[in-house]
Amino acid sequence: MEKLRVFELRDKSDAELLKLLDDLKQELATFRVSKVTATGTSKLSKITLVRKAVAKVLTVYNQRKKEEARKKYKKLSKTPLNLRPKLTRAKRKALTTKQLTMKTIKERKRAENLPKRKYALLA
């Protein structure tokens, strides 16, 4: 079991990734059995390699699925919570620019009818 490279995994299709994932999980299961039966202590160090390989495959697969979901929901007005950008609570609750610029009727009338005063300074 050599170390997996992520850039190589990105070129593979979903079916190939899932097949590789099944193979890695089978291999991990055999290593765990050999660990319990204490036959072949040389295989113990390979458990970490296989676990990390499983994590890499799952990461590539999940990133691809999330990207596809983002493309699907890009045109729609509402997106699921897990596809929205991660923000702090304060930024999520903050007013939008439209809400910030809104004025009451009284403020609008005052701005229309009473222009801003201009002062000329004599030097």
Swiss-Prot record:
Transmembrane segments: none annotated. It comes from the Eukaryota. Keywords: Ribonucleoprotein, Ribosomal protein. Coiled coil: none annotated. GO terms for cellular component: cytosolic large ribosomal subunit. SUPFAM superfamilies: Ribosomal protein L29 (L29p). The keyword Membrane does not apply. One of its GO terms (biological process) is translation. The keyword RNA-binding does not apply. One of its GO terms (molecular function) is mRNA binding. It holds the Pfam family Ribosomal_L29. Gene3D superfamilies: 1.10.287.310, 6.10.250.3450. HAMAP family: Ribosomal_uL29 (MF_00374). Belongs to the universal ribosomal protein uL29 family. This is Large ribosomal subunit protein uL29. The gene is RPL35.
